[in-house]
From Swiss-Prot:
GO terms for molecular function: small GTPase binding. It holds the Pfam family Yip1. One of its GO terms (biological process) is endoplasmic reticulum to Golgi vesicle-mediated transport. May be involved in proper membrane localization of Rab GTPases. The chain crosses the membrane at residues 91-111, 118-138, 154-176, 180-199, 205-225. It is a multi-pass membrane protein. It comes from Schizosaccharomyces pombe (strain 972 / ATCC 24843) (Fission yeast). This is Protein YIP4. One of its GO terms (cellular component) is trans-Golgi network.
Length: 225
């Protein structure tokens, strides 16, 4: 019985040592106790490290804003001359957000004060919902770009319609509004075709273009009204 008791005691001690070894709190206490021993202090040095962040976390706000606006400008160049769709592969949604807010604000200012809040909300929701649906459709058709990349391209492509909304908000003459809207609508479609470049949709481009046509036509019609 004595041998069995000793054997059980040894097993319990081994299990306790394993549990203490697996306990991170206990391990850290052991490390600290070893660190203050004279031998360790004499032979080793402790170096503290700190995570300094990455990318723009350590940049001044002025530099970060400058880089963001420069990126928006580079993507706007693509809208003006849509030849290099690779520019928009590094996607962001700052430009689309600004354009949607400006379009909604221009349309809200051209309505009665009572309806401005509802018009602003509906237009912003319509723009983002339309971009999301068109991007999801393109992705489901087998495009090799992500949904957010597609939304980035479609959002930046709405820049001409933003110009049309500003013009129509301050120019009530219909013979000026119609040519401006038609030209900006065609420009928007031309720029939005960049979402289909190198996207592996050679046999399904019509299925991808049709929703884009309806979305931008609806937005252009709202601007005209």
């Amino acid at each position: 019985m004595t041998d069995i008791g000793k054997h059980n005691t040894e097993i319990e001690q081994d299990e306790m040592e394993n549990l203490l070894r697996m306990d991170p709190v206990r391990s850290s206490l052991d490390v600290e106790s070893r660190a203050i021993e004279p031998d360790n202090i004499a032979g080793e040095s402790i170096v503290e490290t700190r995570f300094t962040g990455g990318d723009s976390l350590d940049e001044p706000i002025r530099v970060t804003l400058f880089n963001e606006f420069r990126a928006i400008g580079e993507k706007l160049v693509y809208v003006l001359y849509p030849k290099n769709a690779q520019v928009l592969r590094d996607w962001d949604l700052w430009g689309p957000l600004i354009f949607s807010l400006v379009i909604a604000l221009a349309l809200a200012l051209s309505t009665d004060k009572i309806e401005r809040e509802s018009v602003f909300t509906v237009v912003v929701a319509l723009i983002w919902f339309g971009e999301a649906v068109c991007s999801l459709n393109i992705k489901l058709l087998g495009a090799n770009i992500s949904i957010f990349q597609s939304m980035c391209i479609l959002g930046y492509s709405s820049f001409p319609l933003m110009i049309a909304s500003i013009v129509c908000a301050f120019v009530p003459l219909i013979f000026i509004r119609i040519p401006v809207i038609v030209a900006m609508y065609a420009w928007t479609l031309f720029a939005a075709m960049g979402v289909l470049q190198n996207s592996n949709l050679s046999n399904k481009k019509l299925l991808a273009v049709y929703p884009l046509f309806l979305f931008y036509f609806s937005l252009a019609w709202i601007i005209f009204l």
